[in-house]
Amino acid sequence: MKHNNVKIMPLGGQAEAGKSMYSIEVNGKIFIIDAGYRFPDLDKLGVDIIIPSFDYLIERKKDIVAIIITHAHNDVMAALPYLLNAIQGVPVYAPNLTADLIEMMIDHYQRHQKKNLHMELIRVKRDDSIKIAGIPVEFFPETHSIPGSVGVAIWTPDGYVVYGGEFIIDFGSPEGFRCNIQKMMEIGKKGVLALMVESSGASNPGYTSPNHKLTNKIESMFEDAPGRIIISSYAQNVFR
């Protein structure tokens, strides 16, 4: 998408599960939103992970002002070490828990790959309003399966570009998981040029149930089980 001095380019995460990465350019300044990987299809033998192509970002390295990571899931943050290896020197913005896990991930990468990465990690609060390279950037809390998740709104002359990522609306979630619909409304009133949200379940009718509603579904299974129960779950689904 190109609109006056605004360019939005998906570098991953389109028509695929995982590998999310987007370039949002405002007046020649590039914001990278998320940097994830995805697992390969079964026929990709010998391939452990698939990351986005960084060729465009390497060409435009001098114009990149920030990497923003919205939450601590591998599909949106685990390609970050590879990205920093390609374009070192770009500051990384992330909420607190995400920043903690980024530090652990970078340390693991450096020890196993025998490479030193320079990373300027800037922690943000979930409802921060800051400026990056002179451009206003708004963060807003979202409800996801890991605490500290945020959405991002980047100012442009024609309205905000809002990146919602992965979220549900649930006012009953515990602190840390809770969304802030008021902050979203305030951004909406200021004017929105483009809204970008995750849509893997968009073809399903109805609404996504909050995680805590699983309790009643599986409680009877625990009560009636004659022996040991083994349950598999997504490792980074902290709520469950």
How would you describe each model-predicted region?
Residues 1-68, 73-240:
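His/Asp/Glu-rich metal-coordinating catalytic cores
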